[in-house]
Amino acid sequence: MKKYLLTVLALFSVLATANDDFKASVTLGYGTNDSIYRGKENKSIPIFESISYKNVYLKGTEIGTKFIDTDRFDTTLFIEFLDGYSIKGSKMDVGYRTINKRKYQQAIGLKADIGIDEISKNLTFSPYFSVGHRGTQAGASLSYLYMPAENIIISPSIGTKYLSKKYTDYYFGIDRDELGGNITNEYNPDGAFEFGAGLYGEYYFTKHISALAYVNMSRYSSEVRKSPITEDRIITNVGAGLKYTF
């Protein structure tokens, strides 16, 4: 998979030099992510690609197209190939390994970016909705772009999203055949909310090379936190990396 992505990036880098409509970047970083489940935190050294041609883009595991694009408003139709969560029983803490495997879903959705120029030209409101065979999500975020210098970007954000009952029941519910160890009761949660805040920063050494860092924190409503297989805590995702823009 990584060889395939690098080959695609190499091809797009050649095309980008010949066509201004092509844009591409690749980021190599290191990140840690608290698990919502009763298991170990995730540590990874990901390669993150971002490729676009006119109104079509590939960003990480998401592909999409903008069909409305104005100075203050744009709308995007997208497909997320790794939506949701993935966990095996063998990766859970001792006493919680009787659960069935939870898998990612593929989701299709709509999202928009709306500039709130009445308050600030750097303030953006971003609602979105997505649906997959394991449930739906709907939410919105508010982000601010601050540039203390031409080569420095700082962007704080806050957001919330709603997870449907079908979604929360699949990822956080407990069926009878999963009982065992510390899991003593079935659990059938209703729809839930997630509240989050984040901070992103990027420093450009040159036009093509930059360093970035980010921290994201989220908190789930009680429907998720009361599940026997989840941790009742703030979920933190921290990372940093180097980015090359073609």
Language-model segments: residues:
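Repeated loop/turn-to-beta-strand initiation elements of outer-membrane beta-barrel proteins
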Residues: N55-L58, F73, E118-F125, E150-I154, ...
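Residues that define the transmembrane beta-barrel architecture of outer-membrane proteins
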Residues: F22, E41-I47, S52, D71, ...
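Outer-membrane beta-barrel transmembrane domain signature
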Residues: G135-G139, S143-V224, I229-D232, Y244-F246
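Structural signature of outer-membrane beta-barrel channels/translocons
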Residues: S52-K54, I68, D113-I119, L145-M147, ...
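Extracellular loop and loop/strand-boundary signature of outer-membrane beta-barrel proteins
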Residues: N33-I36, G95-T98, S126-F129, N182-Y187, ...
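Cleavable N-terminal export/targeting peptides
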Residues: M1-K23, S227-I229
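Short glycine/proline- and aromatic-enriched beta-strand/turn motifs that initiate or cap beta-hairpins
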Residues: N19-T65, K166
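Transmembrane beta-barrel strands of outer-membrane/channel proteins
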Residues: V26-T32, I51, G60-E62, L77-D83, ...
